[in-house]
């Protein structure tokens, strides 16, 4: 059995089951490059402050770089008996340079070491998420440009409400994802902080230079309080919260893609590249990727809830419970980056059935609001107009016709304010084109939304 680095005050060793229960190396392996980066900064600082000699600092750094090379070449075997990523890396360093490796941990604890690794890891993930979000937003804008004059039903309660521009519908998701982008950008602020040097919780008696390691690691600033530094997991919770909101938005979009691609809607068709078949039904084309994004949303929610539950009762400063902060973060990072990539692919290859979309608006009463507005512009109080149109819709339903099928004589019996121009008003395309209020679905309004988005994206 490997001798534990903390084993001096113990008379008995951990039994195998307990050792396995406490070990975290099975899921911490992805932190290895960040752990080595943190150690390289730490040992340089130790040398420059004279805590260890310049020669010792140089030899340890050379050893760390050899371990780093082995890691890149896939020559590192992570061992459970070394507990965690830090002890595994230090074990390999010891193989390279011998007992001198023990000086690396001067003025450092695994408490500040592990959270430094996590700040570095999450900072890199946030860069990837922001880039993937930018690409997806660009794809949505490009799709919207070609769908400004595509007419479709707008829905409330999943019932036809008013005709809208499909471009407008797409730009609503652009706005959601832009808010997601802004939240992740703000997440960077709280992630771009250096906890290294906080040691176990109280700082250290050694004359360390935390500003130097902050600079070497590329952090914006150092934590102001050593206890906060080792116990803070807000930056991860922010990430998981932002990830949950993002997945909720993607899930809503996927739900609509699933509806629109169904036989009953036939509004869009997903590429074969993002669909699968059935093992028994030869005709099936299943939108599995959209369903998977919708399904994976739950696991991201779960990761947020799990860490919130871990954190809610922890006294300052470090607790072993913190070992449970990583797997959910890793899983959510993988999930959202993959989901963004798949979503981008689905939208980039989406086929839009413009004819079916517009035809659907001609077989409903989504133009009823246009008729009520028409009467209101003629001087009739809107509430009265609403009542009259409602009665007319009921009569049309009984007769099996739509508002555009009502003859002018019947219209004028409803209200003498109605003239022949009402038929133009009732057209879906006219209805959409007239709604050019700020943020509205009118063609000119949607064009303005797209132009603003292009400026934001610099495309």
Swiss-Prot record:
* Keyword flag DNA repair: no
Q: Which molecular-function annotations from GO does this UniProt entry contain?
A: argininosuccinate lyase activity
BP terms from Gene Ontology: arginine biosynthetic process via ornithine; L-arginine biosynthetic process
Where is this protein localized, as stated in its record? Cytoplasm
Q: In which pathway does it act?
A: Amino-acid biosynthesis; L-arginine biosynthesis; L-arginine from L-ornithine and carbamoyl phosphate: step 3/3
Recorded catalytic activity of this chain's protein: 2-(N(omega)-L-arginino)succinate = fumarate + L-arginine
| Primary location group | cytoplasm
InterPro entries xref list: Arg_succ_lyase_C (IPR029419), Argininosuccinate_lyase (IPR009049), Fumarase/histidase_N (IPR024083), Fumarate_lyase_CS (IPR020557), Fumarate_lyase_fam (IPR000362), Fumarate_lyase_N (IPR022761), L-Aspartase-like (IPR008948)
Matching PROSITE patterns: FUMARATE_LYASES
Q: Which GO terms describe its cellular component?
A: cytosol
Q: Does the keyword Lyase apply?
A: yes
Please state the Enzyme Commission number of this protein: 4.3.2.1
Q: Which keywords does UniProt give here?
A: Amino-acid biosynthesis, Arginine biosynthesis, Cytoplasm, Lyase
State the PANTHER family in the record. Answer: ARGININOSUCCINATE LYASE
* Protein family membership: Belongs to the lyase 1 family. Argininosuccinate lyase subfamily.
Among NCBIfam families, the record links this protein to: argH
Official protein name in the record: Argininosuccinate lyase
């Amino acid at each position: 059995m490997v001798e534990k680095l903390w084993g001096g005050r113990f008379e008995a060793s951990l039994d195998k089951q307990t050792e396995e229960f406490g070990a975290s190396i099975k899921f911490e392996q992805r932190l290895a490059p960040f752990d080595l980066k943190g150690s390289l900064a730490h040992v340089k600082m130790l040398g420059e402050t004279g805590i260890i000699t310049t020669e010792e600092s140089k030899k340890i750094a050379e050893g760390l770089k050899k371990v780093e090379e082995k890691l890149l070449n896939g020559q590192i075997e992570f061992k459970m008996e070394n507990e965690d990523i830090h002890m595994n890396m230090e074990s390999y360093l010891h193989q390279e340079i011998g007992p001198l490796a023990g000086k690396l941990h001067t003025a450092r604890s695994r408490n500040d070491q592990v959270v430094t690794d996590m700040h570095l890891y999450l900072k890199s993930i946030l860069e990837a998420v922001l880039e993937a979000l930018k690409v997806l937003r660009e794809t949505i804008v490009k799709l919207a440009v070609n769908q400004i004059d595509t007419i479709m039903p707008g829905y409330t309660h999943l019932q036809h409400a008013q005709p809208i521009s499909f471009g407008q519908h797409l730009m609503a998701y652009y706005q959601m994802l832009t808010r997601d982008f802004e939240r992740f950008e703000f997440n960077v602020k709280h992630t771009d902080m250096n906890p290294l040097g906080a040691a176990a919780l109280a700082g250290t008696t050694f004359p360390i230079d935390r500003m130097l390691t902050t600079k070497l690691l590329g952090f914006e600033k150092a934590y102001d309080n050593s206890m906060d530094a080792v116990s803070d997991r807000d930056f991860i919770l922010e990430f998981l919260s932002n990830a949950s909101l993002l997945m909720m938005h993607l899930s809503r979009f996927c739900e609509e893609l699933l509806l629109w691609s169904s036989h009953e809607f036939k509004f869009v068709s997903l590429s074969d590249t993002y669909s699968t078949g059935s093992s028994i039904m030869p005709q099936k084309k299943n939108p599995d990727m959209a369903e998977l994004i919708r399904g994976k949303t739950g696991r991201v929610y779960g990761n947020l809830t799990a860490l919130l539950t871990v954190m809610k009762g922890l006294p300052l400063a470090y607790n072993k419970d913190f070992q449970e902060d990583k797997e959910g973060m890793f899983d959510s990072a993988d999930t959202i980056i993959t989901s963004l990539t798949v979503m981008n692919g689905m939208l980039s290859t989406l086929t839009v059935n413009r004819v079916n979309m517009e035809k659907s608006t001609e077989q409903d009463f989504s133009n009823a609001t246009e008729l009520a507005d028409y009467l209101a512009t003629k001087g009739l109080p809107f509430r009265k107009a609403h009542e009259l149109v409602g009665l007319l819709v009921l009569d049309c339903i009984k007769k099996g016709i739509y508002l555009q099928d009502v003859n002018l004589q019947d219209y004028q019996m409803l209200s003498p304010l109605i003239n022949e121009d009402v038929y133009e008003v009732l057209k879906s395309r006219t209805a959409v084109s007239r709604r050019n209020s700020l943020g509205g679905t009118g063609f000119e309004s949607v064009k303005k939304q797209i132009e603003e988005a292009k400026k934001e994206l610099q495309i």
